[in-house]
């Protein structure tokens, strides 16, 4: 019994000494730890997903990055129902279909920027982000006179560097709150069920 009590007291003393050393170490190194960038006040910047309105509304948008085979039909349907949307266009699409860009603008739809080359924007430097945003901006301005202010990053891929770069060029970075998954080509019924 004496042996068990002595072992218990020794173990308790060792644990107490260890805890005191840990507390002393934390207290001693606390100022150094708080000055490390890892412990800085890093704030993740977020794009716009939705906005508050006085009445229930839906914002519809389209990404124009590859073909234009449905553009005329789409514009006709939107016109028939007096619906205005935003078309987010890549630089390549703008170059390939300048007349469509003009028609979209003339129909009263918003023109949005979807980057020059549809790259993973979070993998780019600030200078590369600026170039990816500025090039399509200049193309649309030359074609339509429109100063675009909305940027949708390809793949929904963003980071602080992208958002800061876009903001520096006068852009708001916007995403979506509902993805129709139309790009998976599941058909109209699937799209309706999704949204």
What is the predicted role of each segment?
Residues 34-121, 132-139, 148:
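Active-site beta->alpha N-cap acidic-glycine motif
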Residues 73, 95, 119-195:
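Catalytic domains of cell-wall/extracellular-matrix polysaccharide-remodeling enzymes
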Residues 1-9:
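N-terminal Lys/Arg-rich, disordered targeting/topogenic segments
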Residues 10-27:
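Hydrophobic membrane-insertion alpha-helices, especially the h-region
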Residues 6, 15-18, 49-52:
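N-terminal non-cleavable signal-anchor helices
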Residues 4, 21-24, 108:
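A general, composition-driven signal for non-globular sequence regions
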């Amino acid at each position: 019994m004496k042996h068990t009590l002595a072992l218990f007291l020794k173990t308790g003393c060792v644990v107490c000494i260890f805890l005191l050393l840990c507390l002393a170490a934390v207290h001693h190194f606390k100022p150094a730890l708080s000055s490390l960038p890892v412990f800085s006040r890093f704030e993740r910047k977020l794009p716009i997903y939705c906005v508050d309105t006085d009445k229930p509304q839906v914002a519809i948008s389209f990404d124009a990055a590859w073909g234009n085979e449905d553009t005329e039909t789409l514009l006709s349907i939107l016109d028939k129902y007096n619906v205005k949307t935003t078309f987010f266009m890549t630089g390549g699409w703008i170059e390939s279909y300048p007349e469509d860009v003009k028609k979209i603008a003339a129909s009263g739809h918003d023109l949005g920027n979807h980057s020059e080359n549809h790259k993973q924007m979070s993998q780019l430097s600030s200078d590369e982000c600026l170039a990816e945003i500025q090039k399509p901006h200049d193309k649309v301005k030359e074609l339509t006179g429109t100063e675009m202010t909305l940027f949708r990053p390809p793949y929904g891929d963003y980071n602080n560097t992208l958002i800061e770069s876009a903001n520096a060029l006068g852009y708001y970075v916007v995403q979506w709150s509902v993805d129709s998954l139309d790009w998976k080509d599941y058909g109209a019924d699937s799209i309706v069920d999704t949204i």
